[in-house]
């Protein structure tokens, strides 16, 4: 998300911050060069979750699980996330982060190519968050639209 500096400052001023676990995970990911969502996107997602109160969320692109856990933390307790990751080096780290956060029961973690997995999913999702290979979004779109409630 590209945002002008004044708008970024305003958006970030409205956010009370994250939990210590998420702050630690964010610092760790950034120090290891793992791309995670920026502060203003974190604020936007928290606002969207508060307004929409989704029960079923689909995330395409898990990385180390930062945004997955952010959505777990700031969603309704009965919410469930299905998240997809293809990069083998990040899968164990994401699993470990889900375990450390105590959110495993809220998360279905699917490993593999999102293009194929999306075709196999059924049911409707209240919210779909895409944070994967940007060049593939156009190919994911038909399946994402089919799955979006």
Language model: regions and residue ranges:
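A short alpha-helical cap/connector motif
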Residues: 1-127, 134-149
């Amino acid at each position: 998300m590209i945002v002008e500096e004044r708008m970024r400052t305003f958006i970030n001023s409205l956010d009370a911050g994250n939990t210590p676990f998420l702050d630690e995970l964010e610092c760790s990911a950034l120090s290891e060069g793992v791309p995670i969502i920026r502060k203003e996107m974190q604020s936007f997602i928290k606002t969207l979750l508060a307004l929409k109160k989704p029960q079923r969320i689909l995330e395409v692109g898990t990385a180390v699980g930062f945004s997955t856990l952010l959505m777990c933390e700031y969603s309704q307790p009965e919410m469930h996330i299905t998240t997809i990751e293809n990069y083998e080096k990040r899968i164990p780290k994401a699993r470990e982060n889900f375990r450390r956060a105590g959110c495993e029961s809220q998360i279905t973690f699917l490993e593999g190519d999102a293009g194929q997995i999306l075709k196999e999913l059924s049911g409707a999702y209240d919210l779909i968050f895409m944070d994967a290979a940007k060049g593939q979004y156009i190919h994911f779109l038909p399946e994402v639209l089919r799955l979006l409630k």
